[in-house]
């Protein structure tokens, strides 16, 4: 016996309490009093943690209640039919007195509870069973009745302690916590559902916007296809359309009206009115009129040559006009060195020779249709208007004509004779253009008297200006 066991036994004697018999089960047989064999942990499922010998020399064991396996047969409180279990004591205290002392040690501090709490929790005391009671607070009696009574008392004490704990957690205002928790969970679920619905609506909105943009793009493409089918000009290449904006804006009515006014004096005397009229007519043209005009042109004779097949010839004419004006401006003193009679006689003969040349080059020009001739004449009248606008001498021409009428009537009569010749020449030139002969247009002549007089006959304003300046120099 060591000092620790002696100290424990001395304290037990002083307190009149025997603690060495707790959780110890021995047989009452005198043969096995000192030599009882303890079962191993593998047989009953419990581990032995500590062994000590009491004052009487008997071996006792403290067992830790951590079962390795759950089995009803190995339960420590189960009664054995072949053995009678009693509490071993080493003192002279009787068994009832020891039981009363042990009950006083295991009774808990009980808080007074209401009858309602005891009625609401009847299953707590019954559900505890033998597993809810600590093994240290139970005592194995010598009979089955003593063990049952001890268990009943321990159950009542534990149920009272549990009831006291639950009574303290119940709120005093009468509101059920479970109902509050249930409502809280319901609200959280509703919020989650609302959030999910919002996200779904956002995704659906984005999808609808994408569908809208796609359908709008398809509608725009269909509109372009329909416009291309209705207006064939949109299908023509840009190269062919770049040379025809000026003539496309002139309707057929304006061309027929300009056909009768193709003479040079009318084009010189009314350049401003013609410019305004052509501008207004070009602004009033609508796409429907252009489409109707193209349909009429397509329905006409297929053998007739189109005017738009010669855009380079038209630009060649403009190039020659501009080149001639530049040469005339640079060589102004040379052209004014001679007398007016010589200057006026030369253009007459040159104009006659040029008219004969155009007649010889275009023998079958008069056999063309009148509509084509009117179109060509209107085109040449438009060219003369553009040239007059480029020169910018309309106002000076009006003043020069008035001064010439007052100073030199003889020169005026000669000029009228020259205008008649130039009118005949322009008519022949229009017929030559209708015939499609461009031999005279492809030849470029620089600083020749024939070219100079031919262009002077085509524009009366240039002749008036040259004559007026010649007389000023002679004075």
From Swiss-Prot:
Species lineage: Eukaryota, Fungi, Dikarya, Ascomycota, Saccharomycotina
Entry coiled-coil feature ranges: 179-231
Keyword annotations of the record: Coiled coil, Cytoplasm, Phosphoprotein
Compositionally biased spans, kind Polar residues: 257-287, 332-359, 368-377
First-listed, main subcellular location of the protein, grouped into a coarse class: cytoplasm
Sites bearing Phosphothreonine, chain numbering: 236
Renumbered residue ranges of the record's region Disordered: 32-62, 252-306, 332-377, 400-475
Compartment(s) of residence: Cytoplasm
Phosphoserine sites (modified residues): 244, 286
Lineage top rank: taxon: Eukaryota
UniProt record similarity statement: Belongs to the TDA11 family.
Pfam families xref list: TDA11
Protein name: Topoisomerase I damage affected protein 11
Transmembrane regions listed in the UniProt entry: none
A Gene Ontology cellular-component term: cytoplasm
Extent of Basic and acidic residues compositional bias: 290-301, 403-421
């Amino acid at each position: 016996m060591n000092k620790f066991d002696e100290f424990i036994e001395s304290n037990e004697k002083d307190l009149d309490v025997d603690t060495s018999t707790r959780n110890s089960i021995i047989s009452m047989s005198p043969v096995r009093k000192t030599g009882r064999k303890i079962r191993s942990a593998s047989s009953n499922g419990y581990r032995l943690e500590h062994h000590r010998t009491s004052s009487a020399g008997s071996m006792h064991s403290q067992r830790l209640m951590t079962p390795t396996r759950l089995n009803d047969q190995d339960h420590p409180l189960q009664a054995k039919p072949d053995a009678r279990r009693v509490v071993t004591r080493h003192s002279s205290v009787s068994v009832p007195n020891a039981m009363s002392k042990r009950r006083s040690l295991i009774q808990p501090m009980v808080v007074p509870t209401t009858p309602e709490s005891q009625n609401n929790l009847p299953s707590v005391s019954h559900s505890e069973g033998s597993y809810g009671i600590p093994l240290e607070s139970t005592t194995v009696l010598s009979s089955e009745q003593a063990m049952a009574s001890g268990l009943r008392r321990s159950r009542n004490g534990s149920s009272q302690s549990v009831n006291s704990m639950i009574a303290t957690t119940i709120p005093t205002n009468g509101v059920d916590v479970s109902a509050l928790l249930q409502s809280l969970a319901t609200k959280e679920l509703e919020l989650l559902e609302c959030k999910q619905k919002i996200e779904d609506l956002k995704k659906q909105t984005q999808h609808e916007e994408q569908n809208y943009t796609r359908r709008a793009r398809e509608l725009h493409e269909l509109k372009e296809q329909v416009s291309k089918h209705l207006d064939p000009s949109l299908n023509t290449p840009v190269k062919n359309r770049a040379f025809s904006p000026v003539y496309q804006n002139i309707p057929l009515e304006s061309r027929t009206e300009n056909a009768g006014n193709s003479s040079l004096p009318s084009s010189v005397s009314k350049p401003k009115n013609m410019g305004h009229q052509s501008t207004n007519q070009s602004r009033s043209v609508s796409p429907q009129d252009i489409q109707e005009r193209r349909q009429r042109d397509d329905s006409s004779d297929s053998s007739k040559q189109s005017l738009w097949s010669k855009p380079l010839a038209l630009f060649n004419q403009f190039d020659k006009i501009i080149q001639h004006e530049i040469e005339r401006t640079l060589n102004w003193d040379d052209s004014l060195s001679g007398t007016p009679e010589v200057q006026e006689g030369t253009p007459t003969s040159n104009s006659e020779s040029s008219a004969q040349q155009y007649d010889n080059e275009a023998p079958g020009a008069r056999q063309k249709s009148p509509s084509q001739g009117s179109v060509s004449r209107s085109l040449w009248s438009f060219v003369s208007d553009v040239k007059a606008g480029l020169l910018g001498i309309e106002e000076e021409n009006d003043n020069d004509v008035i001064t010439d009428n007052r100073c030199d009537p003889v020169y005026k009569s000669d000029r009228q004779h020259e205008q008649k010749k130039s009118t005949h020449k322009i008519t022949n030139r229009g017929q030559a253009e209708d015939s499609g002969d461009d031999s005279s247009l492809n030849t470029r002549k620089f600083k020749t008297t024939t070219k100079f007089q031919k262009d002077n006959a085509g524009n009366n304003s240039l002749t008036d200006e040259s004559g007026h300046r010649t007389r000023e120099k002679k004075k």
